Amino acid sequence: MFERIISFAIQQRWLVLLAVFGMAGLGIFSYNRLPIDAVPDITNVQVQVNTSAPGYSPLETEQRVTYPIEVVMAGLPGLEQTRSLSRYGLSQVTVIFKDGTDVYFARQLVNQRIQEAKDNLPEGVVPAMGPISTGLGEIYLWTVEAEEGARKADGTAYTPTDLREIQDWVVRPQLRNVPGVTEINTIGGFNKQYLVAPSLERLASYGLTLTDVVNALNKNNDNVGAGYIERRGEQYLVRAPGQVASEDDIRNIIVGTAQGQPIRIRDIGDVEIGKELRTGAATENGKEVVLGTVFMLIGENSRAVSKAVDEKVASINRTMPEGVKIVTVYDRTRLVDKAIATVKKNLLEGAVLVIVILFLFLGNIRAALITATIIPLAMLFTFTGMVNYKISANLMSLGALDFGIIIDGAVVIVENCVRRLAHAQEHHGRPLTRSERFHEVFAAAKEARRPLIFGQLIIMIVYLPIFALTGVEGKMFHPMAFTVVLALLGAMILSVTFVPAAVALFIGERVAEKENRLMLWAKRRYEPLLEKSLANTAVVLTFAAVSIVLCVAIAARLGSEFIPNLNEGDIAIQALRIPGTSLSQSVEMQKTIETTLKAKFPEIERVFARTGTAEIASDPMPPNISDGYIMLKPEKDWPEPKKTHAELLSAIQEEAGKIPGNNYEFSQPIQLRFNELISGVRSDVAVKIFGDDNNVLSETAKKVSAVLQGIPGAQEVKVEQTTGLPMLTVKIDREKAARYGLNMSDVQDAVATGVGGRDSGTFFQGDRRFDIVVRLPEAVRGEVEALRRLPIPLPKGVDARTTFIPLSEVATLEMAPGPNQISRENGKRRIVISANVRGRDIGSFVPEAEAAIQSQVKIPAGYWMTWGGTFEQLQSATTRLQVVVPVALLLVFVLLFAMFNNIKDGLLVFTGIPFALTGGILALWIRGIPMSITAAVGFIALCGVAVLNGLVMLSFIRSLREEGHSLDSAVRVGALTRLRPVLMTALVASLGFVPMAIATGTGAEVQRPLATVVIGGILSSTALTLLVLPVLYRLAHRKDEDAEDTREPVTQTHQPDQGRQPA
């Protein structure tokens, strides 16, 4: 089949070139549509169910809201896991589905079960699904700020409430219409409310209750339609408006009467524009701000959506009131652009190095150009496939592309064509005719097709194990394997179509094969080394075996991690205070952190944070926790440009540690989300303890935490804050309440309305709407003694008058700590001890920590412990690769057997793999890089290249034997003749990765292990191919030589570069 393809390509060369140009045009079109990102989105298919349950304690929230929702979710098709969190007034259930489940189908299933659960939930508690986004969907954050001295139209300064109103009613509606945006979340400032604050004394003097005020507001704030009437042939719509239009309208609402006189709201309390009882706040550089967040629709491209949002923000800014502006504080595009710049730089530099090697070794400019053309053409082919399969260009998908490996097949064919054309011209003693030239090109391509096809297939097959990865690791590495295989496939197709056609067209009548100085130098050095190797077989093989054994020992000491942490250039800082810290106190403490860090470190551009829970509780936090971002300036603007990111982080940690009242957890914006998506925790590793009793869980967790803190490398060890939330409990005495004729709900309603407030209608202002809330004045709400005097209305007597008793008559007020939060996983309560690992690898940290915990902590009966975090993914990927990699290597051997039809020669080529691995292991050890899945991908790529080198040399030695050369002659001539292609293959493959190995840009740390492994492995593999493989071949075939009939000896004057030279 391939012979016909090659023949067609040469005969129809212009048609082939036209088709290649068409493919290139499609590739350019695809490149312009190619989604670009920093890393693949590894979010599992999950649906969040958020439920607001005002006034419910964590325990009540778990019992009455979380548990019923969890129960109905059980048994959903494709359900993989449920996680839940119950906090004061909030329940969040995360339903996780198996990979491949359509997210919209998953949401439909969850919504159906929510409808079932509603009957079992308390009245007024309504679950809602979270936005259709991913865990990495927070791509753009901004603040709405007023400049110093900015004034509103009435001359007053802008308040946090005013800024929140602008955010909610001007900015948010416009940004929600940007394509790719699924939701806008807001935190900070205050939701505007019209607050009715009755005086308890005035209410009691008029015999009125808080419920009377609520009812009066509800009955005097509505518009009613009354159909229509017809009059003199015209139709009139009848309506009776009664909606309040101003604060005065609210003040004039009648609540009741006293001695025939109306009692209005203004008579019993104040009406003012008030503030909500907020659950979250935002700060930036030490001052309160309003912070907005864009949630990207799942499946969209973060760079494209961020740019569209940024353009819309610029448009909105031009329409903002004077002195008010939107300031972008986080834009994912910045990270994406820096990461892609690193990838582009590495690929471009790698391509240049590869092309230089081609020019140096081929010695023919046109031949080198034809070979080099495969690089952009294969890339354009790859881009087309990536667009069709919706794979974004990112650090992972483009991180394993090596142009040297991609063009290996083309190098083999072009070199063979040049050699045959030169030899044919020398044989005829004249320039070749066109038909003779085409014949030689066909013969050369035909000779090379077998090692080319088998070599490329072998490299593709070694990538198959990566496709066996599942879950998070699968989502990270599948794109990488896909793009490499696609590029190799494109290069292979081009090698048997474009390359023969281009050689036939552009390599002219006069072809001279001449060796450059570099090759002559290499041969002069190689020939004596080869002779010494052949003369000292035992020494060479012993050295090779010892090298393998030593590297196996080194490999056991390398350590391991899932993937290297991407240096995002910014820092995430989470500040934790003791449970019960109020929101206002947390905000003040956070301001101190921000002002201190901003003043101490000129490298910091800004510090901003979210404290508590935002409007959409996608990431619920209690008021004692602040989730902060430290945005750094570009390194060129640092006062000390040589200062490393790690040194700056260490200095920031030290300075922050001096501020009292806070514990910290440091991470990076994407890394933090990455860890959280993996196992529901934000740290590198986590110990999860499961059981029933919260107190037992808490006590056990403290013991485990103490052990973890003693393990070298453990930092920021903390136990999930499950207890210690201060609670003021109104304990109602049923007997006393019954004596006064009161129901429990009568007392509860009075407390709930007075302290928590009650919505009593809506105030409309154009298309804006604000709640009207009845709540006691802050002076009363904040005083325990005042609450004890809260009037509780008694049932009306015969005179229809309302009488009151103080709350203290039927209830006591008790202050005691209660549960802070309750976490559950797969229907069971759990507590998490989290830790970040620095200065060592996770792979060695976890076994040491596990052994220490087992020896020092006794887990109670009925309770159990598991590990979470990135270690979980490392174990999963390692287990799967241990099964699949041997299968792939077996397939490689089967291909080698098919190539040679000889088990012995197949095994000889196969020995290239362990020698390649030794070089990769040694390179990692020298550079101090632990083993990771990224490094494992490098070893996988290495296996293909190592086998390809051996294939090139052994196939030629076999051909010489078939021509009648003696064993020693075939080995020597074959090794010297194939020195050039072996060195070219090794150099282009390794040099293509050199920029990746030494790069320092954003994302370089992710690619570095892979590149290091390939470079080190190719060096050792090349040494094997050039020195050990000839020794092994002669040793393996010595008996065959002895058994053969005596041949005519081949003279030593044979020149290795003459005669038939198949690839």
From Swiss-Prot:
Residues 1049-1063 have a biased composition (Polar residues). Residues 1040-1063 are annotated as: Disordered. Pfam families: ACR_tran. The chain crosses the membrane at residues 14-29, 350-370, 452-472, 487-507, 534-554, 883-903, 906-926, 937-957, 982-1004, 1013-1033. One of its GO terms (biological process) is response to cadmium ion. It is a multi-pass membrane protein. The keyword Iron does not apply. GO terms for molecular function: monoatomic cation transmembrane transporter activity; xenobiotic transmembrane transporter activity. Has a low cation transport activity for cobalt, it is essential for the expression of cobalt, zinc, and cadmium resistance. CzcA and CzcB together would act in zinc efflux nearly as effectively as the complete CZC efflux system (CzcABC). Belongs to the resistance-nodulation-cell division (RND) (TC 2.A.6) family. PANTHER family: CATION EFFLUX SYSTEM (ACRB_ACRD_ACRF FAMILY), PTHR32063. This is Cation efflux system protein CzcA.
